[in-house]
Amino acid sequence: MALMALDHTRDFFTIGPFDPRDVADPALFLTRWITHFCAPAFVLLSGLSAYLYGRGRGRAELSRFLLARGLWLILIEFTLINFAWGFDPSFYRGLGAGVIWVIGASMLVLAALIWLPRWPIAVIALGMIFGHNLVDGIRAEDLGAAGPLWRVLHDPGRIQITETFRIYTLYALIPWAGVMAAGCLLGPTMLQDPETRRRRLYQLGAAITAGFVLLRATNLYGDPAPWSMQATPLATILSFINTEKYPPSLLFLMMTLGPSLMLLAAFEHTRGWIAGGLATFGRVPFFYYVVHLYLIHALAIAAAFEMVGVLVARAPEIGLGLPGVYLAWLVVLALLYPLCRWFAGVKARRKEWWWSYL
C-alpha cells in the first residue's frame, strides 16, 4: 500500500514525462520498478480475501458477493477514481480503466469460476498466467469490430467510443483474472498452522522467483522484450528486470509474485511502529486507495502553485527531483495514517452489511 502511494506521488510530482521502461535514469527506474510489486500483490490478495470470505458460506452467496463487489469497484473506477486523476467532472479526455477496474472485472470472472472444482480453476488460472504471452502478436487494431473487446482482454490501449469520447484500458483482464483466481487457490495454504504456512509460502515464492531467473535468462518466452548485456553490470541488471506490465507478462508476474509471497511470510509476525502503520493502511485498502489519490493530487496542485503560481498538478516544466518526490511521499503517508486509523476504527464498530464494500 505504501509503495503504491510512492508510485502515484512520483507520477504527480516528477519533473517531465517518464517512460516506465526507460532505464536511462537508474534511480528513477528503480523507484518505478519497486512499485511494480503493488498491483500483483493487491490482485492476488483480493483473490485470497474472496476465499476467506466464502468460508462457511455457500458458493451462491460468495458468487453474489463477488458480482456485487465487482460491479461496485468498476463503478468507483469510472467515477471517483477517474475524477481523482484529473479533477475534471466533464471527463472530456475520456475514462481510464485502471487497477480498481481490473480487480472488479476479475471478481466478475471469479464469481463464475468458483462454481468449478478446484483443479479446473487451477488449470484456467495457470493457463491465463502462463499462456497469455502466446497471443502477444494479436493486435486490437487488426481485429476490426472485435478490437475493443481485445483491448479489454489482452491488448491495453484506447477504445474510441464516439468522436470525442474514449476509454483507455491500462490493465488487461486475462492475466489479472488469472492472478486473482490463483490468490483464491492460495486460500487453503493460509489456513494452515503458522509454521507450515510460512514454510510453504517461502517454498512457493522461492520456486517462482527461481523460475523467473531461469526463464528470463533464456530469453525464450514470457516477455515481449528480451534482455541483453549492457555496458555496465548495473545496466545489465536493469535490462534483466525490465519486464512488461501492460499487459503483465508471465515474467513480470513471476518477478513480482515470487518475492511477494516470501515477504508475506516474512512480515507475518513483524512488530514495531512501521509494521503497525503499514497494518493500519492494510486494514482499510479501499479507503486508502481512494483517499490517497485525492490527497496526492491536491498536494501536487499546492506544490505547483507555490513554485510557479499555477493551479495545475502535472506539466512538463514543473515538478520535483527524486529526493523531493520521496519527501512528498513521506508527507503523504504521514497525512494518510491518522485518516486510515480513524476509518479503521469506525469500520470495526459498524456492523451494517454495506461496510464490507468500503
Q: Whereabouts are the PLM-identified features?
A:
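Alpha-helical transmembrane segments and their immediate juxtamembrane cytosolic regions
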Residues: 1-358
